């Protein structure tokens, strides 16, 4: 119980952990990947504070996206497609984590537990804390339950605030499919990526009949696996062998194509829609989003050596690491902060300060779990021989339980993402395809999934302890 309570309380000890990790950072650590991950989430937050606007009109609260009607801001979103940068870095981290677990002791289920716990910790803190705060605020007459979009659509305020959960849902899908995608990358790296890119482009450009329109949703899977797979290429060293000028040419070509599309057609080219308009490039991802993502990743790769040299400065690396140790917390809370600034009549200049205070108060778990490679530990080489099959008893059962537990967590997160937390009451039933439940049941799925997930790792220890005691 004490450990659970400590998750929600600020702790200076967790901040000292960051100093220790920075001092012991391995010289072989890919600091560029850390920078890319941080930049991706910061871009998403910057987009929210610069592109979104809330204003009163005729008793309604209108939410607008400035990039929807401004060509110059549309161009800005091409360079701030932060979610693509984030999942590129996650592809790198997930492949390294897979080999760290499977390559050493063959525990594929331990990989799932580690990867999911890393992000779900801050998410659980956020869900519980925001549930309490939002339900208190919603009792106020000044709290708008719904927002009106530019197309006269209605969006629940809570759903708007919980938009960051979409990243969590995609992250969980990438982790769930990682064992399969890593196998494909090992056997058919280039064929896999080319096939996924082709499928993404075809699904986006084919006009399906109305009864087959659901096929467009497959681009959620194909598109993000493509970006994730590119991170695999960086992790196993294939990208590092490419001449840096190639990335510069790809950057010029992709952005040149986007500028051509802007001048030659009337296509909607913003990459930051926040589900506020029927026309968008993220829901599901389109060819335009794919081209912009490839261009942005290539731009970052062309600057890799410069970034690495800058991050070799220990003081700057300390600053970056402090941001890194709180980045999930800041990202999850940033739309809550944005909405609160409007609600209390503050200016956006307060946003950085409020975000820092929020990260200090609610980021204790993330900081305490923050790890950088120690000088005493060598990074696992992804090029090592493919791990032999596990010989441990019931290993298939453990992996199946871990996978199904992760799926249960994913369903709970999707339910909260679409239904909101406490919107119109905790017991209001919400429907999404085959999901039909209230908020308590959605949160229950997450906790049951996490409980079962962690049993796959810790269950054997408990069994040995019980048998040893008897």
Where are these regions (language model features)?
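Alpha-helical transmembrane segments and their immediate juxtamembrane cytosolic regions
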Residues: 2-470
